[in-house]
């Protein structure tokens, strides 16, 4: 159900102009479909696809110990992300389970930007 409190991504008007079917997803108005699933699948396989990720959570981690901190909470090797690079990794909870998965972007100079799922943004922080 769409709520008046749902937020719009910067691409919302473009989605509407392309006749997207819009749904509410964790407080965001997002496109779920434009044409048929088969037509969209074939277009993605033979041409290109675009996914609006504006709704995802963005968390900045910065400082001299930022890499060491991230290395402790993620299962993948953070050092694989050279400046300007990205590592994808599960994020561990305190008991060792999976809290979320995230992209860790190395912004350089002891600064990282985590891209986490919209539904888990508050629990990650």
Question: Which residue ranges define each predicted feature?
Answer:
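Basic, glycine/lysine-rich polyanion-binding surfaces/domains
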Residues: 1-125
């Amino acid at each position: 159900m769409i709520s008046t409190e749902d937020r719009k991504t910067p691409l919302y008007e473009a989605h509407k102009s392309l006749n997207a079917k819009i749904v509410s997803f964790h407080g965001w108005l997002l496109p779920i479909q434009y044409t048929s699933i088969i037509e969209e699948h074939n277009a993605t396989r033979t041409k290109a696809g675009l996914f609006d990720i504006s709704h995802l959570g963005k968390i900045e981690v910065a400082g001299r110990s930022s890499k060491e901190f991230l290395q402790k909470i993620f299962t993948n090797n953070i050092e694989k992300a050279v400046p300007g690079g990205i590592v994808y990794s599960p994020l561990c909870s305190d008991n060792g389970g999976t809290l979320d998965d995230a992209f860790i972007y190395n912004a350089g100079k002891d600064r990282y930007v985590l891209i986490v799922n919209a539904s888990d943004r508050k629990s990650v922080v």
